[in-house]
């Protein structure tokens, strides 16, 4: 019988294509374990016993965390833990939490899962470890369980519970997991295989704490996990021609969206305060009420430290999971990494599924950041400064300060530019005055020579532009063009002697010598002009 059960489970771990092709014969057998979400949330046996959805959701997470911890201590593969969780989900979709102690049922499911997956653990070990976890706040727990009376009582409880679980499950041990379809599909992608497999694997493990396995087939869950993992890693999954990657899983876009959203909902839920946990515990009948004081508040971060450590606290557990087709992508996820992963998944969900956006600040398990899966907004996108006429300023003080600084910088630049312009204008004006005086000195020359020089200036493209004089020095010559474009106020002529006298005073502080030089030496003007020409030429450059 064990061989038959193992063969069924191995069949359930087949690849994506073979799963879709060969599992048709088994669909009728497992169809009774698939329900609609509305049916699960509104018509469950626990709801009929006045346990609301919030309490039942907490109880579901509670026994999943318990099973993860129990499996790690028993050092069983992750696939065995997953099988035990699915057995527990199936049991409580048919039975009420008010009539059954979830920890006792979970212990029975772990014992059964070990036998189904051919990784059995002795009943004594299962009982002892389970008892220690349930009463972990009691320092005398290790001594109590060694007492024969206590042990026999627990043993009888587990064996009676096994009968109830077997009858409730209808002796149906066919369980299909998303692990193998997940790994087989990622092998085909050839894109960030290791990272993608690890993150998607963790999403599958976290999804065990929801009712996804009661709503969707394993390959649908695998597709949702790969979708979220790709979003987190920002990996573009390849497509084969017109066939996109998710079509390999025989899943519709609506199913893919539903699976992804429900996985993300797990991380959005607020932490349950200790008072609410106590209320939930006390409201549930059976033997669970007297354990209220020993249970901490329901924190997703704490649950993550148990559920995301794949295959236990050592790598040996992962190696053993290879026998069940689940160890190919096994990894050890630290608790610190789980805390860091919260923001990534929240941001991933914010980008992909705004309808389920939550700002509860839950330290969610899983792979990160969803780097925030994403989302950094550059400041340029928040507040773009196009100009004073078209400015979009955000409400943050930082953006307002940036805008003010930029405006101030622009005003400073304009001010500096204006000062440079005025300075240049002054230099040019002085230069023009000097040129005018020099032209007066040249007045003693023939009019013909002046006209020739004027024509030469025209040929060389001299341009007088208001206050700026631009000289074309194509041939290395400086040509003076005293044209009619000069301002009339600058061309106002007095007597040549007076202007020469003024120029002499400014340059030599000896007006008499200059005046005599102009009279006695006709060539003095030419000589004086020649001496000043190189200096003016250098200023022009």
UniProtKB/Swiss-Prot annotation:
Record keywords: Cell cycle, Cell division, Cyclin, Phosphoprotein
GO biological process, one term: response to virus
Start-end of Basic and acidic residues biased regions: 336-354, 493-511, 529-541
Single GO MF annotation: cyclin-dependent protein serine/threonine kinase regulator activity
Origin: domain of life: Eukaryota
Region described as Disordered: 277-366, 445-541
Polar residues bias spans: 307-325, 519-528
Matches recorded under Gene3D superfamilies: Cyclin-like (1.10.472.10)
UniProt modified residues of type Phosphoserine: 396
Pfam annotation, one family: Cyclin_N
InterPro entries in the record: Cyclin-like_dom, Cyclin-like_sf, Cyclin/Ssn8, Cyclin_N
SUPFAM superfamilies recorded: Cyclin-like
Family of the protein in this entry: Belongs to the cyclin family. Cyclin T subfamily.
Protein's recorded name: Cyclin-T1-4
Gene giving rise to this polypeptide: CYCT1-4
